[in-house]
């Protein structure tokens, strides 16, 4: 993003299906004025950003914005996966009076931040040691399931983002199969996102309750 001055502001946002986080980013990558809002309390992304701009007294500033969004962003028209929000990149820029507006996939943003982490910001899981300058897989459950890959090319990192959470859930044992069979009574197609996410935990719980009740009834 462009560097900040007294009249220029870099606005950044992390937009998920449950929460939206807005902040001001400076040229040294430091951020301030971080605010979190619940998406369900607003009718549109425009409404949330307008509120933040008013609260932070930014109306008279020249604003460059970069929004990380939990859905595909390559068409210029955004239809969020886990939220009933739709908008045009061009129209949003005009409505907010922005100097510039960039949209990136939320897991592209997360993946590109991985090389910036220091050892104190990392937690080791499992055995073995990390190999430097090798591809990095990024995966995280939230409202949905986000995935991305980070590939080193010519001393730079390139991100390959996708919608991996939408691939079919593959059952591997008897309990998995029982859970899958229950979830298929709710939806014709069951993706990994439906078991590995915030609402996925709820669905697994519901499935286990159903399975246990059915077994008790048969005993």
What kind of feature is each model-predicted range?
Residues 28-63, 71-83:
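N-terminal phosphate-binding loop and adjacent alpha-helix
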Residues 20-24, 71, 138-139, 145-151:
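Short beta-strand scaffold segments in enzyme catalytic cores
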Residues 27-29, 83-86, 117-125, 152-160:
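A glycine- and small-aliphatic-rich helix-loop capping segment at beta-alpha/alpha-beta transitions
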Residues 58-108, 112-121, 138:
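Short beta-strand-loop/turn "lid" adjacent to the catalytic site in phosphate-handling enzymes
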Residues 127-137, 145-219:
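Glycine/GP-enriched mid-protein hinge/lid loop-to-helix segment characteristic of carbohydrate kinases
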Residues 22, 92, 201:
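Residue-level signal for inorganic ion chemistry
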Residues 2-51, 161-166:
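Short glycine-rich, Thr/Ser-proximal phosphate-binding strand/loop in the N-terminal lobe
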Residues 7-8, 98-99, 132-136:
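Short coil/turn connectors at secondary-structure junctions
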């Amino acid at each position: 993003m462009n560097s900040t001055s007294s009249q220029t502001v870099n606005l950044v946002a992390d937009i998920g299906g449950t929460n939206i986080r807005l902040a001001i980013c400076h040229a040294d990558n430091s951020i301030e004025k971080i605010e979190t809002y619940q998406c369900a309390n607003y009718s549109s992304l425009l409404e949330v950003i307008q509120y933040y701009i008013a609260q932070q007294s930014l109306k008279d500033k020249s604003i460059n914005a970069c929004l990380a969004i939990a859905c595909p962003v390559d068409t210029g028209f955004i239809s969020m996966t886990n939220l009933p929000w739709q908008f045009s990149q061009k129209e949003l820029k005009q409505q907010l009076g922005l100097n510039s507006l960039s949209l990136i996939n939320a897991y592209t943003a997360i993946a590109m931040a991985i090389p910036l982490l220091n050892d104190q910001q990392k937690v080791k899981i499992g055995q073995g040691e990390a190999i430097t300058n090798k591809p990095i897989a990024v995966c995280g459950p939230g409202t949905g399931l986000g995935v991305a890959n980070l590939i080193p090319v010519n001393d730079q990192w390139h991100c390959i983002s996708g919608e991996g959470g939408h691939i079919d859930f593959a059952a591997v044992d008897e309990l998995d199969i029982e859970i899958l069979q229950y979830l298929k009574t709710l939806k014709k197609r069951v993706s990994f996102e439906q078991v590995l996410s915030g609402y996925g935990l709820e669905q697994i719980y519901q499935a286990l309750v159903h399975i246990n009740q059915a077994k008790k009834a048969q005993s």
